């Protein structure tokens, strides 16, 4: 999915879930696409409120992963995770994503995982470098909301 596709899929997901947009926060590859760090992603990783996640656990397929938070396969292109409301978020073109600093922390964590596929680890390292530069720019210095 390119940026335009991410935006469309995000708004469709928000509508389907019936949630406020700021309660559906993209992370991982989709957030990197929205920030311009990469051109495309395979899917959306969306963090949602615990109640929405629990509902999805009963309606969809729950996948438990060691060393990574649980996820629900909501659709072929969308995985849901539990939203951490204490983490910083920003809105880019109407799409809520974790802030560059939060995404940087996530990428650092993922890159240290022993079972991380090599190709993803290489991409993580590139994005870590780009995010380290991005967090230094005034464009993303807003407080968490």
Task: Provide a role label for each language-model segment.
Residues 1-145:
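Compositionally biased terminal segments of proteins
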């Amino acid at each position: 999915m390119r940026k335009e596709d991410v935006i469309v899929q995000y708004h469709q997901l928000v509508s389907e879930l019936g949630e406020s947009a700021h309660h559906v926060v993209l992370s991982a590859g989709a957030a990197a696409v929205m920030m311009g760090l990469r051109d495309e992603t395979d899917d959306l990783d969306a963090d949602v409120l615990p109640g929405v996640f629990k509902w999805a656990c009963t309606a969809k397929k729950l996948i438990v992963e060691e060393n990574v938070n649980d996820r629900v396969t909501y659709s072929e292109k969308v995985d849901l995770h539990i939203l951490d409301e204490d983490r910083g978020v920003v809105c880019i073109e109407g799409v809520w994503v974790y802030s560059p600093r939060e995404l940087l922390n996530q990428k650092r964590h993922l890159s240290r995982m022993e079972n991380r596929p090599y190709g993803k680890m290489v991409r993580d390292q590139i994005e870590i470098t780009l995010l380290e530069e991005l967090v230094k720019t005034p464009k993303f210095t807003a407080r968490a909301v």
